[in-house]
Design a protein with these regions (language model features):
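Small-molecule-sensing regulatory modules
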Residues: 1-42, 116, 121-282
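Helix N-cap/beta->alpha junction signal
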Residues: 2, 48, 112-113
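Beta->alpha turn/N-cap motifs
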Residues: 28, 47-48, 65-70, 152-157
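Short active-site-adjacent helix-start/loop capping segments
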Residues: 31-35, 63, 71-74
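Short, structured active-site "lid" loops
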Residues: 36-62
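Short, Asp-centered acidic motifs that coordinate Mg2+ and/or phosphate
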Residues: 60-64, 148-149
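A conserved helix-loop-strand patch within extracytoplasmic ligand-binding domains
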Residues: 67-68, 74-125
Length: 282
């Protein structure tokens, strides 16, 4: 999927100016080779910091990621310099090929703690199992009979041309998407000129991502946290809705709205409010 995302960035650069030289560089990561050993680092997916090292060392000039994988701590020397228009942010249910319903006796798979938490509320009593690896490897395990179903990102499947595998879309109220889900982010080295990314960058996406990532950073989130938030813009106003979890595992929901120019502050304020509510519960 990373290659497909990078190729979309390359096409956008070529449309801006065909004379800008662009080369695709693929970098093998520990997540590609040993997905079961890959661990988050500061709230980032493991492949992110490996690509960031290549960027910092000058091996590459741009790095392309799913924004949801880099939603916690950020390196100011390697800023996000462009964010794509948002693809479908919803989570979806995928069943084994040729199967029309969840099969009894097999777990339902997912790849993040916030999905696992929300699925436990939607399907009480069902066995849930975390599944590492990329989209295709997870689908292989699903089709080989290891799982009754797999909950995945609609955006990831659509990027790979696998929309036909989707059996059910969860609304953003049923399953609040992960922070940054559906966005592709481009990283560069601080201070470098990246005007050639003007066609790729989406202003509304930038503001929404600021709100969601501010929420995640304030709560110390990432794939290892059950908390998440989803923001949207309507008529110059931004709304961000999310939740955290108290020590007893109960959901604490909240929603803030305000002018788009306050995007980052809205994310921080929602997170702070939810954290205060959780602290009051003890």
């Amino acid at each position: 999927m990373a290659v497909a995302q990078a190729e979309a960035v390359m096409r956008s650069i070529a449309e801006w100016d065909i004379r800008v030289p662009v080369e695709l560089v693929t970098i093998p990561t520990i997540q590609d080779q040993y997905p079961e050993l890959a661990k988050e680092v500061d709230g980032r997916a493991p492949y992110v910091w490996e690509l960031e090292k290549a960027l910092a060392d000058g091996v590459i000039d741009l790095s392309v990621h799913s924004l949801k994988d880099m939603a916690a701590k950020r390196n100011p020397l390697l800023p996000v310099c462009a964010v794509s228009q948002r693809e479908d942010p919803r989570d979806v249910l995928v069943l084994p090929s040729g199967v029309g319903r969840l099969l009894k006796g097999r777990p339902l798979g997912c790849s993040s703690v916030c999905r696992r938490y929300q699925l436990g509320k939607l399907f009480p009593g069902i066995q849930l199992k975390m599944v590492p690896g990329d989209v295709l490897s997870r689908l292989d395990r699903l089709d080989n009979g290891e799982f009754s179903g797999m909950v995945m990102s609609a955006a990831d499947l659509k990027t790979l041309g696998l929309e036909s595998r989707i059996n059910r879309y969860f609304t953003a109220r049923e399953m609040v998407p992960g922070c940054g889900q559906g966005f592709v982010a481009v990283q560069c080295r601080a201070g470098e000129r990246v005007g050639y990314l003007a066609n790729y960058h989406n202003a509304n996406s930038w503001e929404i991502s600021l709100a969601e990532l501010a929420f995640s950073q304030t709560l110390g989130g990432g794939h290892s946290s059950p908390a998440t938030a989803h923001a949207w813009i309507d008529g110059g106003q931004m709304t961000i809705r999310g939740y955290t979890v108290d020590r007893q595992g109960e959901k604490i929901p909240g929603m803030f709205s305000g002018p788009v120019k306050r995007a980052q502050k809205l994310g921080v304020e929602l997170a702070a409010y939810l954290q205060a509510e959780a602290n009051e519960r003890g």
